[in-house]
Amino acid sequence: HLLSRRQRQMCIRDRVNTLIMIVFSLLCIGAFGFWYHAGYNGIYLIHPRKVFHPLSIVGIILLVPGTQCLSTYLVSFTASLFPQWMKAYEKLMESTGINSGLTVSMFFYSILLAPIGEELLFRGVTMHQAKRVFPFWAANIMQALLFGLFHMNMIQGIYAFFLGMVLGYICEKGGSIYQSILFHMMFNFWGTIISGILPTGNSTLFFVLYFATGVICTFSGLILFRFGTNRLAQKQAAPLYLENTGYDTFYPSN
C-alpha cells in the first residue's frame, strides 16, 4: 500500500512538472515570438522553398547524428572528470520525472514546444540583440553560454553550450530561424526516440566507429548545409526573389 501511494505521488509529480514545462514553453513562444516578429519584421507564413534548399536539409539531417555522437562523447568525458556532476544530473532527472518514461505530453513538449520556444528566445531574440553590439562570433558565444546556463546543471549545460553554438551557426548562416528550429526538433527527436533503439557496445572498435561516425556526419553535414544555403542566397539575390524571402529579413552571412 505504501509503494502504491508513492507511485501515485510520483505520477502526480511527473504530470505537474510536465505541465509546468509546457506552460513555460507556450509563454516563451508567445512572448519571444511576438518580440522577434515585431523587432525583426518576421514573416510567419512563408514558402518552404524560400527558406530551405534540398542540400541544406540533407546537411541538417546529417548534422543530427553527428552532433548527437559528439555530444555523447562530450558528456562521457565530462562525467569521467567530474563524476559528482553526473550524480547531480541523474538526481535532477529523477526528481523531475524525466526518466520515468516518455508520455504523449512529454513527447509533445520535447519535440515541438521546447525547440520552438528555445530557438525564439536564444537564437531569435538573444543572438540578434547581441549582434547589434557584437560581431556574430561573440554574439553566438554569448547566446550559447546563456543556453547552457538555462539548463541549470553542469552536464546538460556543457553539451547545451556546444549545441547552442551549432544552432547559432545554422540560424546565422542559413538566414532563417526556421533552419535552427528544424535541427533542434530533429536533435531532440533523435535523443528522445532513436537513441533508445540503436545498438550499443563497450568494445574499443565500437567507440572508435561511433566517434568516427560523429565526426564524418558533422563535417559532411556542415559542408552540405553551407553549399545549400549559398545556393539559396544566390537565388534570393536575384530581383525576382527580393520580396518576402522568409521568416527572417537578414541574409545568410558568408
Predicted regions and their residues:
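Juxtamembrane helix-loop-helix connectors linking adjacent transmembrane helices
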Residues: 43-114, 132
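Small-polar-interrupted transmembrane alpha-helices in polytopic inner-membrane proteins
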Residues: 136-151, 185
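Functionally important transmembrane alpha-helices
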Residues: 5-6, 144, 156-214
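Single conserved hydrophobic/aromatic residue that forms the stacking wall/gate
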Residues: 1-12
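Membrane-helix interface linkers and caps
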Residues: 16-62, 77-82, 175-176, 225-242
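Membrane-interface helix/loop boundary segments of multi-pass membrane proteins
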Residues: 117-142, 169-176
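Hydrophobic alpha-helical transmembrane segments
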Residues: 19, 57-62, 104-108, 137-142, ...
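C-terminal membrane module of polytopic membrane proteins
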Residues: 185-254
